[in-house]
Amino acid sequence: LKIIPIVRLATRFSPEKNSWIVPNRKEIINQLDFLSGLTWPTDKKHIIVYNEVNHASEWGGRVDPEEYSRILKFVSDWARTEEKNYIILPAAMDLAAPNGHSTLEAFNYLSQMYKFDPDIFSYIDIWNSHSYPNPGFSSVPTKIGKNSLRGFQYDLDFLKSKTGNDYKVMITETGWKENAWNSKWLESYYTYAMQHIWSDERVIAVTPFLLKGAPGPFASFSFYDADNEPTNQFYAFRGALREI
């Protein structure tokens, strides 16, 4: 078994703000020092610089592309101060989020990052995408659009238009929310995705959401239940792997 860790940086959740706090520089340095002190099973150390920051709940109760840009640049610069072989991925956007008080549409957010710092995307090595079959995490895999399994393609097209560069991508969240309607189709959905979408040569990793989320609000996505028994999601995914 070969494990390639993809570690997402996180902070503390503030019940008062009902959001994850924004890290300061000292906290970032401590996080990177901690990670540098670990024994990694790979030479390259893949880290994701926080999560879905186009949600206020993920960023101190506010949506702030400029502040996140500064943090992303600082993490990238600091991670490269030593020969630690860090590979930087940005926070994935929630591609289904609208423009509003507590969220910002993904490409609006990314455009504001680019406007603030036209070099911002040069501080990342690999793109990071959350490409879900929306709406409701339960659409068919053949759907096309930024809110579909093909969302990463819209990410990469945006980057190409701004930088002229072709990025590789890791899809670090994707998959279906199982329900009574799609339960019997999950294996065929995963098979289609593997054969026709995730086979894109620019995709270098796909990590479905999630291994174990039961009990809790993510139980219907989970590959293992609360008793550590495989779920229908597990068997559907395994069956799809056998088809390719």
Positions of PLM-derived features:
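Histidine-bearing beta->alpha loop at or near hydrolase active sites
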Residues: 51, 176, 213
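Aromatic- and kink-enriched transmembrane "portal" helix at the membrane-lumen/periplasm boundary
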Residues: 53-58
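Substrate-engagement module of ASCE P-loop NTPases
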Residues: 198
